[in-house]
Amino acid sequence: NTQIAPKSDKYDVTVQNISVNGEIWTGVGTNTRHTFPELKDIVAANPPEASNDENCPPENACSCVMKISFGNFDYWAGGDLQYNGKSSFSWKNIELACAQVGGKVDVMKANHHGVTNTNQAEALKAHDPRHIVVCSWVDCHPRTKVLNEMITTLPNVDVHITNFWQGERPSGVDDKVTAEEAARVKLYDGHIVVRVTDGGRFYRIMTLEDVQGTMKVKKVTTKYTSR
């Protein structure tokens, strides 16, 4: 946790690197384990577009993954982690491997915008967040199935989405969000800000206006105690 260090020691902040390019921290000291196949063993007709059944790491699995802590507060930033192709190669389930070493957090950014083959139940259980923030940039973020996975796996979780589309979704691609699912989305349509205070003891989450550029605070959650 010294590779990305604060400029000042005024605050008890650490950034623990969890994974990059398939090199995953073991949870002990600076020890890591290599999970991707050796270069000589990689087989793919077109590596940049490797399919799930090819022995080649997809770009998203190479994400830089980290756990950011401030006092008792922990935040998960899993980049574009996914589990595509895990039935063909166990090492492709890098999302779960990272979640297991990263452990519990207060808030997590949903892996890979909440698209298909991400945010699996076992990874969600490992993190057990009180809040999940989804950074969306198309109408199908997060996928309805993934949103449902989040709220059924974690009965007490609140979901916050930067842009939440509740209308019809492309036929054959995704289902319309149900009223029950929509009710679990607390903050949406704006910048999602997590403000941690009192040396990491407490935090609030808020939405800021993001259309006119005023950054006006639209809504703020109650104060939560960090675990």
Annotate each predicted stretch with a short phrase:
Residues 1-85, 152-158, 162-227:
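Flexible, acidic/histidine-containing loops and adjacent segments that form or flank the divalent-metal
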Residues 52, 57-61, 82-184:
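Cap/insert and terminal regions of metallo-dependent hydrolase folds
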